Amino acid sequence: MIGFYATQLRLLSRWTGGRAGVVRRGVATIVIAMLALVVTAWLIPGITLRDVPSAIVAALALAAMRTLLRPVLIAYVSHISIAVATILTVLAQALAFWLISRVEWIAVDRPEDALVGSLLFSIVNAIVTAMLSTGDDNSFFGTLVRQLAARHRKRDVTREPGVVFIQIDGLAQPILEGHLRAGRCPNLGRWLRSGGMTLNSWKPLLPTQTSASQAGLLHGNDDGIPGFRWWDKKTQRLMVSNHPKDAREIQRRVSSGDGLLAKSGASIGNLLSGDAPRSFLTAATLDDPAREIRRSHVLDWFFISPYSYIRWTLLSVGEVIKELVQARAAARTTSPGPRAFPYPLARAATNVLLRHLSTALVIEEMWRRTSPIYVDFVDYDEIAHHSGPDRVEARDAVAGLDKIIGIIAKAAADGPRPYRFVVLSDHGQSPGAMFADRYGKPLEALIQELAGKQVRVQGATAHVEHWGRISPLLSEASGINGMTRTLTSAPFRHHAGARDDAKEPPDIVVAASGNLAHISFPGMSGRAAMDSIDAAYPGLVDGLVRHPGIGLVMVRVNGRGPVVHGGGGTHDLTEGDIKGVDPLTRFEPTAADGLRRLDAMAECGDVVIVSMFDAASGEVAPFEEQIGSHGGLGGTQGDAFIVHPTEWGIDAPPVGAVTLHKQIRRWVRPAS
C-alpha cells in the first residue's frame, strides 16, 4: 500500500508541476473542502458547524479521507463502474460525517442528515473543482493517469515500443508549417528541432476527403469511394460517408480483414476501423457490438463522474459562447461562413467533447499496452469549414491539438509501454467563398435551370459532417438504439440530402464533396455517355462547361472514354490528346491521374464537376455550405503531411493513401 500511494504522489507531482504544484493542489483541496462543508451546513438544517477551528479540522479530515480513499476505490471497484466508486465514496463520506460529529467537530442530528450532507458535499466539491480546472488540461488528464495507474497497478511492463497515429483531420502542410514558424505548435516544433522526428508531405488523390483517405491509409484499398457522398446506382440510394450505415458498407467493400489495426490495434474517432478489434467513436462499427466497445473506464468516468461531467459541460457552454462572439465579429469584418445553429453546438462537440474524450481513450489504450492506436481529431477540420482554414478560430484549434499531442506523449511516459508517434493529416483544405454565394444560386439550382423545370433534381450539397461527428458521440454516451437511433438518424439523412427509400428516384442527383460534385442520372443504367445525356437534357453539359464557376467537367464520350472539358479546351484522359487550352493546366500535376482513377470506379457519377480555381489566391468555390473545403482539386486541399520518427525514412513523398499505407506497413509491422 505504501508503494501504491507513492506512485499516486509521484504522478500527482509530475502532472501538477513538481513539489510546488503538489502544495498548491493540497491547499486548493483543503479550501474546496472547507467551502463545500460551509455550503453543506448552510443548506442542511441537520448539520451545524460548532466553531471555526473545529470546522477547519473537519474539512481537513474529509479532504484527507477523499484523497486517500478515492484511489483505492478506483483500484478495486471501478472495473464494475465508476458509478460504484462514486456511490461508495458518498457512503464513506456519510460515515465520516457521522464519526466527525461524535468527536464534536461538527453537529449532525440524524444519520440521514449525514447521508444527504455527504451527497451535497460531493456535488459542491465536484462543481468547484471542475470550475477551477476548466483551463487546466494537465490537471484533468493527470487525474485520469492516476486512476489508470491505480486500475492497472499489476500490469507487466512491455519494453517493445507501440505506435500511436494521431490524425489532425484536414490540416494542410503549408498551414502546419506556418504554425511551426510562428511557434504555435511548441510540442511538434520541439520534436522536429530535436532531430528525432521528420516532417514530410504526401499527396492524396481524388477525392481529397476522409473516407477515401482512411480507406487507403487503414485498409490499403480506396477503390469505390468517389466522394464524401454519391448516388449508388446499384442500390438506388445516396451514400454518405459518415452515416454509420453507409460507413459500415464502405468498410465492408474495402476491408480484407487485415487492415492496419487488425489483431491488436484500436480505432478511436475514425470513419473506418482498420479492422481493429477495439473501436470507439468509429462510424463504421457503431452498430457492431463485437467491435465497438461500449464499456471502458474512460467512458464511465467521462459521462458519469460528476467532476468530469461538470467540467466538459462548462467547457462546452464556454465554446458555444466563444463561437457566437467570434461569428459576430467575423460578420463585421469579412464575408461570414455558414455559422448558424446547429454549428455552435457542433463546434462544442468537436472542440471540447470529442477532443477530450478521444484523448482520454488514447491514454487508456496506452495503459492497456494496445498497438497500433489510430485516432482522428476532427475539431480543426470542422472549424476550418466554417471560419476558413487559416482564420484565428482555426489557428486556436491547431494550437489546442498541439497541446493534446504533448499530453498524450506525457501520459505515454507514465504508462507500462513506450510508444512512438506518427502525426499526419488525411488531406488539407482550400479557402474560398461558396459557389452559391459567388453566383447567386447553388449548383443544383443551376442544373435545374439547365435541365428544365419539369426535371426532378435532388441536391445533396448541405454541410453534414458535423451531424456524422455528433452521432458517434451520442451513441457512446447513451447507447442509442431502436427508436432513439431512428429519431436521430432521420434528421441526419434529411440534411445529407437522402430520400426515403420508398420514394421514386429523382431524374438527376447532385452530390457534392467540397468543390467536387457527381451528377448522376438514376434512370440511366450504367455510366451515361455524353450523347445519351445530351439527348435527354440538351445543353446541360455545355451549360456547365461555360459557367464561370465551373473549372472542369468530366464525362465519358462514346468510343473515347473520359474527356475533361473546360477553360476553352478538352483533355482526353485515355489518349492524352489536348484540344485548345488544357483544362487541367491550372490544377495540380496529379489531377489527370486522380480523374482517371475516379472514372475507373463503378460508383463514379455520370458527370464529374470541379469548381473554378484561382491559382493566385488558392481559392476554390465549394458546392457545399463551406468556406474551407476539400474533396476536389485546387489549392492546399491536396497538401497533406506526415510527421514520423526520422529513422523511419520515406524515399519520396507518397502519392495516394494506398501508397502511404504500404509505407506505414513497413514501419509498423516490426514496431508492433
Give the ranges of each region predicted by the language model.
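A long, amphipathic alpha-helix that forms part
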Residues: 352-353, 357, 365, 373, ...
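Active-site neighborhoods of enzymes that stabilize oxyanions during catalysis
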Residues: 235, 242-255, 264, 270-275, ...
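Short, structured active-site-proximal loop/turn typified by the sulfatase FGly-forming signature C/S-X-P-X-R
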Residues: 178-215, 220-224
